[in-house]
C-alpha cells in the first residue's frame, strides 16, 4: 500500500512539474478535455450506429470518466504487471482501454457502445484520432509520455540521492560547427543556444581527420584509439573479407582491436545507439554489442513504459505515419522546385527517415532517462536524426534543420528529467564529424567511381563496389535486431516478418555484398563520402605504383586526370607514398612537390591524414579524394548521398563540442577524435569518475600521445 501511495503522490507532483506549473497544467487539462471530446465524437461518427453519443456534453463526461478510470485503475494493475511480463503488460493495456469504453457505456448518460468488439475497435480509433489532433494542435510534444516514464522510474528506484555528478554525452551525428553556430544565430536550437547565452556552456570546434566518419570518430572518442580503420568499409587481404562498421561481427572485431579496457564507459557507463561500445557496462542499440549475451532494450524499463501508456505505441505509430507523409510532400516539393543538388528519395528512404526521427529518437531519449534514474556514471548516446536527413536532403536544408530542432527538444527533455534523478548530471553535446554538400560523382559524370575505373581498365576486371549506409539505417537494423531477440507477441511477429532479412539473430534490411574472393580479377571499390578506396583483390599484398603500371598501364595517371578526382594516393616501391593530382605530384615521405601540390586544396592536415592512411595495414591500392570546390565547400561523393562525409573538403571535418564552461579543452582546436577522448577522460576524473582497469595485454592508446601518429598497428 505504501508503494501505491508513493506512486500516486509522485504521479501528481511530476505531472505538475512536467506541465509547467498549476496554471499551465489547468490550461492543458482544459484543452486536452476539448480535444478528447472531439476525438470521442469523431470515433462515434466512424462507428456509426454501433457507437452513439446523444450530445457533445455526454461525450465530454465520457472522456472525463475514462480519464478517471485510467488514472485510478491502470497504475494499480500495470505497475505490478510490468514486473511480471512485457506481454502481460501490453495485453492489459488493450484490455483496460476496452474496459474503459464499456464502463463509460454503462455509466455515462447518452453514450452507447455495442459490445466488446466495438469497444476494442473504438478504443484504437479514439487513440489514433486523439493522437493526431493532439499533434496538429501542439497540445503535447511528448511531455506526458516522458513524464509517465519518469513517474514509473521514480517509484521503482530505491536509490538515495548523491551529490556526485554524472555525465551525459549526446552525439548529434553529422552536425558541423559552422552549421550549429548558424542555427543559433538564426534563433533555432533554443536549448543549446540558451546554455551558451546563459554562460553554462561553451561552443568549441575540433578537427576530424581521415576518415571523417562515425566508426573511426567513435572509436577515437570512446576508446582513445582509432588506428586501423581506413574507412567505414575496407577490404582485408589476409582474410579476404570486406569489413563493414555496420556489421555487428565486424564492429565487435573493431572494438577488440582498439580497446585497452579503459573506454569512456568502462566504469558503470551506458552506450546507446552507437557503433562501438566504449567498454560500456550496459549497451543498447549498439552495433558491436548486438550479439552479446543479456541486456538490450528488451530488458529496459523504458521499453516497457512504451507499453505501459495506452497511447504510447499509437502515438509513435501516428507520428511515424505523419513523418512518412511529411517526407513524401517535402520530396515532391524539392523535385518541383528543381533544387540542386537533390537525389531520389523513395518510400524506402521515407520509412527510414520516419524510423530515425520518431522511433529511434523516442527510444534514445527514454533509454537515457532510464540510465540517469539508474544513477549511471556516464552515458553516451548518438542521435542520427540530423545526419540521416542531411545525407539525403543536404546539411543546410529545411528538412535537416527540422530534425536538428527535434534533437534539441529531446535534449531539453533530458535536461528536465535530471531534476528528479538520483544524482546531478553534466551535459556534453558533440558531433563526430560534419557533412559537405555536393552533387555526387555519378550525378556529375554519369558513372560511379567503380564503373569509371573499370572503363579505364578496358573492362579487364570484375567489379564489386559498395557504398556506406547512412548511420540511420545501421541503427534501425540494431533496433530491429534487439526487438526480434526480445520475448513477447510483438517480437515474435517481428521475427516472422523479418525472417528473410535476419542472419544469426541480426537484422539487415540492406545487406552488404561480399567480395567474390575466388575471382582473381575482382576489384573492390568502396565509397565513403568523397573518400574512395580501391583494392585489387587477387593480390595478397598492396600493389605499388610500379606494379600497377605494369599490370594496368596508364591507369593511375588516367584516374588522377579525371575531372571528378582531386587526388590519388599510391605506394611507390622507390619513393614511398605518392600523391598524384591533375597538375602536380607530392611525395609524402620525401616532403617534395613537383608542379602544383594536390594536397594543398584540402587543408593543412591533409598530408598528415594521408600518411596515416598510407601506414595502415589494410591501406588500399588506390586512395582517392574527389574534386573539391573551396568557394562553395562542395565535394563529389563516391556514393549516392548529396550530403556526405568520410573524406576531406568542406565542413565534413569541422565537428563541434559543447561543454560546461568550467571545463577547458587542452587545445584551442583539438585534432583528431582521440584528443576528444583525452579531454573527456580528464573531465570525468575531475568529478571523481575514473575509468576501468586496463586489459592485461592493453597497448598504449593514441590519446595518451601528444598528437595523432602516422604509424598504425592493427
What residue spans do the PLM features occupy?
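Juxtamembrane/disordered regions of integral membrane proteins
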Residues: 2-117, 132-141
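His/Asp/Glu-rich, glycine-adjacent segments
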Residues: 142-144, 224-394, 526-536, 540-543, ...
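Active-site nucleophile/metal-coordination loop of metallo-enzymes that catalyze phosphate/sulfate
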Residues: 166, 177-309, 461-499, 503-510, ...
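Short secondary-structure boundary/capping segments
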Residues: 183-188, 289-293, 394-400, 437-453, ...
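Active-site neighborhoods of enzymes that stabilize oxyanions during catalysis
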Residues: 240, 246-259, 268, 274-279, ...
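A long, amphipathic alpha-helix that forms part
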Residues: 358-359, 363, 371, 379, ...
Amino acid at each position: 500500500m505504501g508503494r501505491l501511495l508513493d506512486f500516486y503522490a509522485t504521479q501528481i507532483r511530476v505531472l505538475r512539474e512536467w506541465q509547467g506549473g498549476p496554471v499551465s497544467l489547468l490550461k492543458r487539462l482544459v484543452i486536452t478535455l476539448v480535444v478528447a471530446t472531439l476525438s470521442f465524437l469523431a470515433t462515434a461518427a466512424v462507428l456509426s450506429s454501433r457507437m452513439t453519443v446523444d450530445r457533445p456534453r455526454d461525450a465530454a463526461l465520457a472522456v472525463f470518466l475514462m480519464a478517471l478510470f485510467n488514472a485510478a485503475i491502470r497504475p494499480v494493475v500495470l505497475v505490478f504487471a510490468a514486473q511480471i511480463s512485457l506481454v502481460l503488460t501490453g495485453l492489459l493495456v488493450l484490455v483496460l482501454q476496452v474496459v474503459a469504453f464499456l464502463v463509460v457505456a454503462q455509466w455515462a448518460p447518452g453514450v452507447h457502445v455495442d459490445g466488446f468488439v466495438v469497444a476494442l475497435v473504438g478504443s484504437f480509433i479514439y487513440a489514433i484520432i486523439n493522437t493526431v489532433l493532439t499533434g496538429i494542435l501542439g497540445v503535447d510534444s511528448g511531455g506526458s509520455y516522458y513524464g509517465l516514464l519518469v513517474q514509473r522510474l521514480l517509484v521503482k528506484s530505491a536509490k538515495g540521492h548523491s551529490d556526485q555528478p554524472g555525465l551525459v554525452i549526446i552525439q548529434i551525428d553529422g552536425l558541423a560547427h559552422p552549421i550549429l553556430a548558424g542555427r543559433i544565430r538564426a534563433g533555432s536550437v533554443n536549448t543549446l543556444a540558451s546554455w551558451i547565452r546563459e554562460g553554462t556552456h561553451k561552443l568549441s570546434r575540433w578537427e576530424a581527420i581521415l576518415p571523417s566518419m562515425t566508426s573511426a570518430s567513435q572509436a577515437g572518442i570512446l576508446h582513445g584509439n582509432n588506428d586501423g580503420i581506413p574507412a567505414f568499409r575496407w577490404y582485408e587481404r589476409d582474410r579476404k573479407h570486406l569489413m563493414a562498421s555496420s556489421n555487428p561481427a565486424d564492429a565487435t572485431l573493431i572494438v577488440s582491436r582498439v580497446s585497452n579496457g579503459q573506454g569512456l564507459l568502462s566504469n558503470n557507463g551506458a552506450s546507446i545507439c552507437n557503433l562501438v561500445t566504449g567498454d560500456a557496462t550496459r549497451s543498447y542499440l549498439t552495433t558491436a554489442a548486438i550479439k552479446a549475451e543479456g541486456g538490450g532494450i528488451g530488458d529496459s524499463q523504458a521499453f516497457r513504459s512504451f507499453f505501459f501508456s495506452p497511447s504510447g505505441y499509437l502515438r509513435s505509430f501516428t507520428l511515424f505515419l505523419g513523418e512518412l507523409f511529411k517526407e513524401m510532400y517535402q520530396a515532391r516539393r524539392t523535385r518541383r522546385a528543381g533544387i540542386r543538388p537533390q537525389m531520389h528519395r523513395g518510400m524506402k528512404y521515407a520509412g527510414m527517415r520516419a524510423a530515425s526521427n520518431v522511433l529511434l529518437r523516442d527510444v534514445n531519449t527514454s533509454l537515457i532517462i532510464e540510465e540517469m534514474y539508474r544513477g549511471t556514471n556516464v552515458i553516451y548516446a548518438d542521435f542520427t536524426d540530423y545526419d540521416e536527413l542531411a545525407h539525403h536532403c543536404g546539411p543546410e536544408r529545411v528538412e535537416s534543420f527540422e530534425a536538428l530542432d527535434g534533437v534539441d527538444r529531446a535534449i531539453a527533455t533530458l535536461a528536465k528529467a535530471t531534476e528528479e534523478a538520483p544524482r546531478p548530471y553534466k551535459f556534453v553535446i558533440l558531433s563526430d564529424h560534419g557533412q559537405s554538400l555536393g552533387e555526387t560523382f555519378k550525378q556529375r559524370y554519369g558513372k560511379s567511381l567503380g564503373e569509371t575505373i573499370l572503363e579505364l581498365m578496358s573492362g579487364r576486371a570484375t567489379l564489386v563496389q559498395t557504398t556506406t549506409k547512412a548511420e540511420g539505417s545501421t541503427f534501425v537494423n540494431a533496433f530491429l535486431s534487439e526487438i526480434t531477440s526480445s520475448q513477447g507477441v510483438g517480437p515474435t511477429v517481428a521475427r516472422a516478418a523479418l525472417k528473410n532479412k535476419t542472419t544469426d539473430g541480426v537484422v539487415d534490411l540492406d545487406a552488404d555484398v561480399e567480395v567474390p574472393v575466388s575471382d582473381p580479377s575482382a576489384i573492390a571499390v568502396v565509397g565513403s563520402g568523397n573518400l574512395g578506396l580501391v583494392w585489387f583483390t587477387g593480390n595478397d599484398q598492396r600493389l605499388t605504383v610500379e606494379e600497377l603500371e605494369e599490370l594496368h598501364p596508364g591507369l593511375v595517371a588516367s584516374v588522377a586526370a579525371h575531372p571528378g578526382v582531386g587526388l590519388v594516393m599510391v605506394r611507390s616501391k622507390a619513393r614511398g607514398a605518392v600523391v598524384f593530382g591533375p597538375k602536380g605530384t607530392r611525395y609524402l615521405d620525401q616532403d617534395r612537390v613537383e608542379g602544383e601540390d594536390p594536397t594543398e586544396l584540402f587543408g593543412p592536415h591533409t598530408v598528415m591524414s594521408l600518411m596515416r592512411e598510407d601506414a595502415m595495414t589494410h591501406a588500399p591500392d588506390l586512395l582517392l579524394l574527389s574534386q573539391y570546390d573551396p568557394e562553395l565547400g562542395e565535394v563529389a561523393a563516391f556514393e549516392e548521398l548529396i550530403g556526405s562525409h568520410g573524406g576531406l573538403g568542406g565542413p565534413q571535418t569541422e565537428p563541434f563540442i559543447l561543454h560546461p564552461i568550467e571545463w577547458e579543452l587542452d587545445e584551442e582546436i583539438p585534432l583528431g577524435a582521440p584528443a576528444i577522448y583525452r579531454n573527456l577522460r580528464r573531465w570525468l576524473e575531475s568529478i571523481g569518475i575514473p575509468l576501468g582497469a586496463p586489459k592485461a595485454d592493453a597497448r598504449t592508446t593514441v590519446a595518451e600521445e601528444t598528437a595523432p601518429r602516422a604509424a598504425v598497428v592493427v
